[in-house]
From Swiss-Prot:
Pathway connected to this protein: Carbohydrate metabolism; tricarboxylic acid cycle; isocitrate from oxaloacetate: step 1/2
Name the record gives this protein: Citrate synthase
Catalytic activity: oxaloacetate + acetyl-CoA + H2O = citrate + CoA + H(+)
Organism per entry: Bartonella quintana (strain Toulouse) (Rochalimaea quintana)
Other remarks in the entry: Citrate synthase is found in nearly all cells capable of oxidative metabolism.
Keyword terms of this UniProt record: Transferase, Tricarboxylic acid cycle
Name of one Pfam family that matches: Citrate_synt
Protein family per UniProt: Belongs to the citrate synthase family.
Source species taxonomy: Bacteria, Pseudomonadati, Pseudomonadota, Alphaproteobacteria, Hyphomicrobiales
Length: 438
């Protein structure tokens, strides 16, 4: 990495800071000495201009629409490989050889079963519990069921925990779905692929044979690959921050799942489907398009544009292709929401307003439609996102633990509250709050 210097003057004191340049993307100013030298912090709400770590895993260029896993473009990985190949890549930094792929796949498939006591653990939840609430609990509980792999200082235990998370999260996700609809849990099968196994555990029933549709299985696999990692987003940063305290890996991933549950992060595809429900019919699309263009109208089209990608989301093109393959394979012709989605897509792609502002349908738009076509209810969408992102969280956590520069996260603040004041006895206080109790 090349290095030069930045100079900053604070309170008439000029200091010199190192500037580091990565392989790709913007450089960073190292500010660790800023507080010591100037008694001043930097202020960056949301950390949108702050690099919290050094990483070799995922790179994003939002202006150019680039997403790389360990240097490999996402479209190549999704089209030419499969999800477990991307898992290996994110975990080890290189694509596997043929034999390494065979061994890794076998290892994952042989660890997909979960402890049998998990079946009783599920019965502690209401049937109408949100699946994400169940997943947060299950991921945290894994440290109780698999406490032989929670020593983060042991490299072998770290890798065992990583393998267990990649292999068992789809089983737990399928169990959460089955429990919510009152059906029997389905055990994984070692002869099926990762994605096919997940579909089998979700949709097969004991009374009849479930046949794997290769088109649908491939679509599920692509969805997993496209969502495997996305640099230092909110949930990944949460995993790293929790992990910096020395928490066990299962607790860290549970924290990531909890963060992903937030509608501003992982709930975008679910929000997109709810928007389609709000539109209601193809005939009302022009009305909502007009509302989306009106700056004074609070309505926003979900699933269009992206906070990071100022150009086209590189995952969207593959997801669009996959979406249409699924719709064609299933020959869905009488689903009102899918009709609205397809019509809305065509309208937006040909509307000058959306073209000029580069508000293209993003990966959430197409993945939401695809998941609905596959038969998943909207409340499962974020669970599937968490399933796919588990490998990214695991890889980022592992990288952080193995970083010699790693230390516990401790963000600072700009304090704007009261200065020191004297305690007032309760009989002399005057209420300044408008609190109501019931």
């Amino acid at each position: 990495m090349s290095e030069n210097k930045a100079h900053i003057t604070v309170n008439n004191k000029k200091i010199e800071l190192s500037v580091r340049k990565g392989t790709l993307g913007p450089g960073v100013i190292e500010i660790a000495s800023l507080y010591k030298e100037t008694d001043t912090f930097t202020y960056d709400p949301g950390f949108t201009s702050t690099a919290s770590c050094e990483s070799k895993i995922t790179y994003i260029d939002g202006d150019k629409g680039i997403l790389l896993y360990c240097g490999y473009p996402i479209d190549q990985l999704a089209e030419k490989g499969d999800f477990l190949e991307s898992c290996y890549l994110l975990l080890y930094g290189e694509l596997p050889t043929k034999q390494e792929k065979i061994d890794f796949d076998r290892c994952i498939m042989q660890h997909m079963m979960v402890h049998e006591q998990f079946t009783r653990f599920f019965h502690g939840f209401r049937r109408d519990s949100h699946p994400m609430a169940v997943m947060v609990a299950c991921l945290g509980a894994m440290s109780a069921f698999y406490h032989d792999s929670i020593d983060i200082k042991d490299a072998q235990q770290r890798m065992i925990a990583a393998i267990r998370l990649i292999s068992k999260v789809p089983t737990l996700a399928a169990m959460a779905y089955k429990y919510s609809i009152g059906q029997a849990f389905v055990y994984p099968r070692n002869d099926l692929s990762y994605a096919a196994n997940f579909l089998h555990m979700c949709f097969s029933v004991p009374c009849e044979e479930y046949k794997i549709n290769p088109v649908l299985s491939r679509a599920m696999d692509r969805i997993f690959t496209l969502h495997a990692d996305h640099e230092q987003n909110a949930s990944t940063s949460t995993v790293r921050l929790v992990g910096s305290s020395g928490a066990n890996p299962f607790a860290c991933i549970a924290a990531g799942v909890a963060c992903l549950w937030g509608p501003a992060h992982g709930g975008a595809n679910e929000a997109c489907l709810k928007m389609l429900q709000k539109i209601g019919s193809v005939e009302r699309i022009p009305e909502f398009i007009a509302r989306a263009k009106d700056k004074n109208d609070p309505f926003r089209l979900m699933g269009f544009g992206h906070r990071v990608y100022k150009n086209y989301d590189p995952r969207a093109k593959i997801m669009q292709q996959t979406c249409h393959e699924v719709l064609k394979e299933l020959n869905i012709q009488d689903d009102p929401l899918l009709d609205i989605a397809i019509a809305l897509e065509n309208t937006a792609l040909n509307d000058e307003y959306f073209i000029e502002k580069k508000l293209y349908p993003n990966v959430d738009f197409y993945s939401g439609i695809t998941l609905k076509a596959l038969g998943f209810p909207t409340e499962m969408f974020t669970v599937l996102f968490a399933l796919a992102r588990s490998i990214g969280w695991v890889a980022q956590w592992k990288e952080m633990i193995e970083d010699p520069a790693q230390k516990i996260g401790r963000p600072r603040q700009l304090y704007t509250g009261y200065a020191a004041r004297e305690y007032v006895s309760i009989d002399k206080r005057i209420s300044k709050n408008k609190m109501t109790t019931q």
